[in-house]
């Protein structure tokens, strides 16, 4: 079930689709995600193991897909920091490292994108790939005011701080 997200009092709005893609209402490009696991690339909208929930009473989505030895979890929520951002959190609950590909490069990240991304998937120009260790989390953020890339501030709220 797709839902609208944004910050109260802010003008930016977006839609989180039922597979965790983010479609900004300002006409900018959709942000989709893919997972390079041990055996293959996983595209959420094509995965029968896809599950999504919204935290009761809060605008935080959680989308899960099954990968070898666990789940890959994506959470989406908005914060007012830096003029408003949509934060996308990827938690690898499996026991193996993976890589996450996102279809936009104008995002803040908690770690540098991979210089030599994995092969086996055709990604749109401007996509980035981020390594995610086993049992670890990476976050990216899409600025609401204007496209930015760079380091995500360490004090950016987590999904637990939003709910």
Give, region by region, the residue ranges found by the protein language model.
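Terminal accessory carbohydrate-recognition/targeting modules of carbohydrate-active enzymes
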Residues: 1-163
């Amino acid at each position: 079930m797709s839902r609208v997200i944004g910050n109260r009092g802010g003008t930016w709005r977006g839609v989180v689709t039922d597979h965790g893609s983010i479609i900004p209402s300002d006409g900018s490009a959709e942000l989709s995600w893919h997972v390079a696991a041990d055996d293959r690339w996983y595209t959420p909208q094509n995965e029968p193991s896809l599950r999504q929930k919204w935290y009761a009473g809060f605008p935080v989505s959680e989308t899960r897909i099954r990968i070898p030895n666990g789940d890959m979890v994506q959470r989406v929520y908005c914060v007012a920091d830096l003029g408003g951002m949509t934060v996308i959190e990827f938690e690898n609950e499996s026991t193996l490292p993976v890589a996450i590909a996102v279809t936009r490069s104008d995002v803040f990240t908690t770690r540098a994108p991979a210089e030599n991304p994995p092969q086996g998937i055709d990604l749109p120009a401007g996509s980035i790939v981020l390594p995610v260790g086993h049992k670890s989390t990476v976050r990216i953020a899409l600025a609401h005011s204007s496209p930015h890339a760079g380091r995500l501030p360490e004090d950016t709220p987590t999904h637990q701080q939003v709910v």
